[in-house]
Amino acid sequence: MHPKEIVRTGYNKIASRYTAKRVADSEDVQLLDLLVKRLPKQAMLLDAGCGSGYPITQFLEQFFRVTGVDFANQQLRLARTRLPGSTFVKADICRMPFKNDVFDAVCSYYAIIHVPRREQSRLLIDFLRILKMDGLALLCMGAGDIPDDTADYQGTEMFWSHYDKETNLRMVKESGFNILWSKVVKDPIDAHAAHLFVLGQKG
C-alpha cells in the first residue's frame, strides 16, 4: 500500500479514538499563541492536515477565518460536524487547490511527519506559495531521523518519515522561510515521542 493510503486508511479507522485522546491545554496547543499574537483578528489561516479539527482548528477559529484541509473522510466528517464555522476541503496537503498569496498563515500539526521526507521540501515550498508576503507558518516536523517507516499506532498501521532537527531547520530555510522560533516539544499522546515546532515567515 502507498504510504499516503496507509495514513489515510489509518486515520479514518481511528478518527474518533484519536480525537478523544487529544487535549485542549497541551503545550502544542498553547504554541498557537505564537500566531494569535502576530496576526490580526479574522486573518485568513490554513490548517493543513486538520484531521477532526480538535483541538487545533477549534482553537484557531476563535480568532481567525480558518480553512482546514485533510484527505481522511472520517476525520473531515467529525470536523464539519464539530466546527460549522470553519471551511473544510478534502485534499492531499501535497496537492492543495489554492491560488498564490491567499493565506496570512499556515498551521500544520502532525501531518508533515506522515509525508515521505523526500517530498517535504516541495510541500514547504507550496506552503510558501499560498502565503501572502510576510505570512507565517507554524509547522510540526520530526525531531529525529526516521526513514520511511511503518508501525502500529493505536491499533492500526501508520507511516512516518522525517529528518532530524537540524536537517529540518535547514530545509525550512532552504525552502524560503525566515525562521523566527523553534522548539522540540513532547508529544501530548505518546510519551516516547517529540516533535520539532518551527515558526517561519515568508519574506
What is each residue range found by the language model?
Residues S121-M133:
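A short glycine-rich, Lys/Arg-flanked "PGG" loop and its adjoining helix->strand segment in the class I
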